[in-house]
Amino acid sequence: MNTQQLAKLRSIVPEMRRVRHIHFVGIGGAGMGGIAEVLANEGYQISGSDLAPNPVTQQLMNLGATIYFNHRPENVRDASVVVVSSAISADNPEIVAAHEARIPVIRRAEMLAELMRFRHGIAIAGTHGKTTTTAMVSSIYAEAGLDPTFVNGGLVKAAGVHARLGHGRYLIAEADESDASFLHLQPMVAIVTNIEADHMDTYQGDFENLKQTFINFLHNLPFYGRAVMCVDDPVIRELLPRVGRQTTTYGFSEDADVRVEDYQQIGPQGHFTLLRQDKEPMRVTLNAPGRHNALNAAAAVAVATEEGIDDEAILRALESFQGTGRRFDFLGEFPLEPVNGKSGTAMLVDDYGHHPTEVDATIKAARAGWPDKNLVMLFQPHRFTRTRDLYDDFANVLTQVDTLLMLEVYPAGEAPIPGADSRSLCRTIRGRGKIDPILVPDPAQVAEMLAPVLIGNDLILVQGAGNIGKIARSLAEIKLKPQTPEEEQHD
């Protein structure tokens, strides 16, 4: 951003008083890095720490940020404020040092709230679909020439970044309920895609507590704000009478204000009609598969229509939508060496979904778009607590594929829980009598154990939120071919 553009922005968005140097602890996370990127482009001095480099930290370093790949007290020296990820413990040496030096320590969402304070904020919340819906809203507003600022939890592929500083008055942001920190946000418009039991440790295992927190989030809207909510979701339908703000509903349901009709999926695209009150029907081609993505698009269209964005811009944005990183992310179609006397190709798709509802939606999209493919899933459960709490749901959903390979649970810092491990889950699924899952004890064995189950007309779904995305990329790099020890050593 040049000096003239920055001066224009300053006339719209005042600087945070006396704040010059902002330090992020856990800066390599997508959400943290996105906020840091926006602030770097606004002209603030950015530093941060994390344990290992990744594309997020590299992008920030390219913008002039100072990144430390350790956690040491001296890293926070001279910082005006320290922003902390929810994954960072209170005894982190940088947090301790900041408190001792009386440097303010705030959560990620508090800084996001400051970015939103002087802008027209649009916040996207919900258990599933937040990242994709945020990208869709951002794409529509950009196509309409409104040049929004956006902060997303995943890579917006069209932009090549998780976040971008725009010159317009809009800030579009993913709102995270996992630690209830979205309560810091005060947007003008809020989307809620759905509400399910997840991150229940935050809510003391009480689903009513989670539901009330979503109500409180919506009541952060001004009285003239608007809540856009998916009426197909039974919990949202239950909560609607308790929302004391203007609402717009969307969904496949007949009573939705923005209704999806005549949905058809052809390969990676969805085709459907949107019916809106007092507007002409909109025939949509969406460059993203699955009924769940049609719902995400309906939410984005509801917000854009309310803002008065013309239909042509909306339709262009949805037809050219490039998606987000690790959300039904097509990594390639690769020729196979003859296996079991057969040759052919296998498609490779990487997906972040790690809740049974998300996994189910991904499987349904794959079946609808490629009904004749042999559907092979490589799944990595995420967190022992989630595996325990949703054990039966996982067992039911995972039986829908033709072949299942399962990695060990990605712990995300949790201690193992007896009976909530991958071996137990495989045993339970096997007992259902539909498929015979294969446990992959070592990620290095994935390509070797995958090859024999391919038939030459395959769609491979690499599914999960842990480090499985790296495995997906490595499979693409080696074109699904198991490597010999000599090849691995050469690499």
Curated annotation (Swiss-Prot):
Pfam families: Mur_ligase (PF01225), Mur_ligase_C (PF02875), Mur_ligase_M (PF08245)
UniProt keyword Iron present: no
Amino acids binding ATP: 126-132
Name this polypeptide is given: UDP-N-acetylmuramate--L-alanine ligase
EC numbers for this chain: 6.3.2.8
Organism field: Shigella sonnei (strain Ss046)
GO cellular component, as recorded: cytoplasm
Localization annotation: Cytoplasm
Catalytic activity entry: UDP-N-acetyl-alpha-D-muramate + L-alanine + ATP = UDP-N-acetyl-alpha-D-muramoyl-L-alanine + ADP + phosphate + H(+)
